[in-house]
């Protein structure tokens, strides 16, 4: 019999809206002795059953809900059905975009809290970020081996958030070890090298797929500065769409080297594509002093804000970098700017960019909005799943 969790008065409201998180301060009583990752039943203060979820005694998110169906068992059939339905929801755009790399499970948004699963050609990468996800690791792997026979499964549970769950980092093969962790994926006709062991996140930024396509659409005959370029995949779309020049900037030489490999992989000329190992903030200031200008600038920085306490400082950082970028744009030039922080709401991000335009003494028109690709869905009961915001600004 599972442990029983009773909530404080009034703390059931979010669960009635099917939100999957229960915070520690909502918990009143615990009947039983649940261990890390155990499935528990949750009741309101009057004893009405609400949900069943995974217990995490060290996390502020004390319980992550698996199901709002009292009769549903959290077993192999449960995980198999979740994986099947997630794949079915993605089939249409996988076929449309001719994708061989995509996110299969986006955690809470796909009904599996703390579970991230990405498919890269014949590799599957699991990132298990919660106590419940960690507890059911081998059940999930067993389901994946049946659904995707012949695929090789690798774990990248090396994210700091696991510490908040009382979990150690875990990486390595979950199926038979392979000689290489590299593969090639394809999106919208562009081929990309991915290393699932050493690449960022689970190997690559799948969430920016639609934004890369948009960048290519705008790039024809333009001089493009691609900042925080990582493996230069924005540049691939720009070069493939006849950009006049593309400069990729990143602090990682390994990432830039992979960018050069990606360029060659797609048979694109390196005559008008260059790679600069430099701190973006310093380089932008130097270009401003040198009075360099561009027709299009892409700003895709790492996350500036991890907590609410950092939000004010993050806004200053976003404003500063967007201001300098606007000062480097030719009249009528385009700025593609992004924030990947869930705490940075879309309205606040737009205000920060508008403030940057004022400080730059430029006028900006927001001509298009961008967000995470469709394999990173935003479910109606989990608005926190909306984290990646992008703006296309025409700057005069």
Curated annotation (Swiss-Prot):
Keyword rRNA-binding found: no
Alphabetized GO MF terms: RNA binding; rRNA (cytosine) methyltransferase activity
Domain of life: Bacteria
PROSITE patterns: PUA
Swiss-Prot/TrEMBL keywords: Cytoplasm, Methyltransferase, RNA-binding, rRNA processing, S-adenosyl-L-methionine, Transferase
Main location: cytoplasm
GO cellular component, one term: cytoplasm
Root EC class: transferase
A Pfam cross-reference name: PUA_3
Family per similarity comment: Belongs to the methyltransferase superfamily. RlmI family.
Protein name: Ribosomal RNA large subunit methyltransferase I
Record organism: Colwellia psychrerythraea (strain 34H / ATCC BAA-681)
């Amino acid at each position: 019999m599972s442990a029983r969790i009773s909530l404080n008065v009034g703390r059931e409201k979010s669960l009635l809206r099917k939100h999957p998180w229960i915070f520690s301060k909502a918990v009143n009583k615990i009947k039983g002795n649940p261990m890390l990752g155990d499935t528990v039943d949750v009741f309101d203060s009057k004893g009405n059953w609400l949900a069943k979820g995974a217990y995490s005694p060290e996390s502020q998110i004390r319980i992550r809900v698996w199901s709002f169906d009292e009769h549903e068992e959290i077993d192999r059939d449960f995980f198999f059905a979740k994986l099947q339905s997630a794949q079915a929801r993605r089939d249409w755009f996988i076929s449309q975009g001719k994708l061989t790399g995509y996110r299969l499970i986006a955690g809470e948004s796909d009904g599996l809290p703390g579970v991230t699963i990405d498919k890269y050609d014949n590799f599957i990468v699991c990132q298990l970020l919660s106590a419940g996800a960690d507890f059911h690791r081998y059940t999930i792997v067993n389901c994946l081996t049946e659904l995707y026979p012949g695929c090789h499964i690798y774990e990248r549970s090396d994210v700091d958030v696991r510490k908040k769950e009382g979990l150690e980092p875990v990486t390595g093969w979950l199926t038979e070890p392979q000689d290489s962790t590299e593969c090639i994926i394809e999106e919208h006709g562009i081929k990309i090298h991915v290393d699932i062991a050493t690449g960022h996140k689970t190997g690559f930024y799948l969430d920016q797929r639609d934004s890369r396509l948009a960048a290519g659409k705008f790039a024809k005959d333009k001089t493009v500065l691609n900042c925080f370029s990582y493996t230069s995949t924005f540049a691939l779309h720009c070069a493939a769409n006849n950009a006049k020049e593309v400069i990729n900037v990143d602090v990682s030489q390994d990432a830039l080297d992979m960018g050069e490999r990606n360029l060659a992989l797609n048979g694109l000329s390196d005559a008008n594509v260059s790679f600069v190992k430099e701190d973006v903030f310093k380089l932008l200031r130097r270009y401003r002093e040198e009075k360099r200008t561009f027709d299009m600038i892409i700003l895709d920085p790492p996350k500036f804000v991890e907590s609410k306490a950092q939000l004010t400082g993050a806004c200053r950082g976003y404003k500063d970098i967007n201001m300098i970028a606007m000062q480097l744009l030719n009249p009528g030039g385009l700025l593609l700017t992004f924030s990947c922080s869930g705490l940075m709401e879309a309205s606040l991000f737009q205000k920060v960019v508008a403030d940057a335009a004022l400080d730059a003494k430029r006028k900006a028109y927001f001509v298009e909005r961008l967000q995470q690709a469709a394999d990173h869905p935003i479910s109606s009961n989990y608005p926190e799943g909306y984290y990646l915001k992008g703006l296309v600004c025409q700057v005069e």
